[in-house]
Amino acid sequence: LVGSEMCIRDRGNGTPCVEPFAAMYREGEKLKSLCDLENAIEIFKKERIGNLIPEVQTNIGLGLSNAKQHEDVLAIPGRVIKNGEDIFTGARPQFGGSRHVANIVLTVMQHDPEKRAVMNIKYTDSLLQICKKLKFQIASFDRSKEPKKVRIREGSSLEWGTEKAITTYGSVPDIIYDLGGIRKEEMIRVLAKDIDSLVKKVLAIHRLYKKEGC
């Protein structure tokens, strides 16, 4: 097919076949991912989850299937910001919209390709206890143990911390948290297989947090 994107796929019997329109499928996945993330943002706005947003604000990331690079991860340029309980975004989600978020997603996917969504929320003792009450699998990392070569390399801290938490825990958990460090706010990161699962987890945390009057 002249001018068409094509890829080679094994039939399963050792005979390769040509699968046309691979680029079209990828673009379809990108469009669905964009719609899913924008819908999630609208749900969070309606639920007024501002009480979960940390001082450094929040971002949400979603990797394409088989994501390999920053441009394969959808995130929000400028992050999600809060005003009281209300939240706002200054831009639509974009692929390659956040290197920091992409580093987390890509590191997670190296261990479990099915886990492609992440969102950071603020850390408090109460929120961590709520995550435990919800029976989430929880892991953590200690920023004070971050190697110097990682610390001085821009954007490497979250990649290192995510890797450390997962390898110590033994699998990809629902929650990865850290207690912060010098000029670093403590944080909880919610992990999920897709945006729908991520929304359910975050709303479960938010609703129990409000119910308990935290």
Give the predicted meaning of each segment.
Residues 1-8:
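Short, small-residue-biased leader/transition segments that mark boundaries at the very start
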Residues 9-31:
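Phosphate-binding loop/pocket of nucleotide- and phosphate-handling active sites
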Residues 26-139:
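N-terminal, charge-rich interaction modules
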Residues 105-110, 174-182:
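Short, flexible, solvent-exposed loop/turn segments with mixed acidic/basic and small polar residues
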Residues 117-119, 186-193:
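Short cationic amphipathic helices and targeting signals
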Residues 127-130, 195-201:
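Short, conserved charged micro-motifs
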Residues 206-214:
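A common structural junction motif
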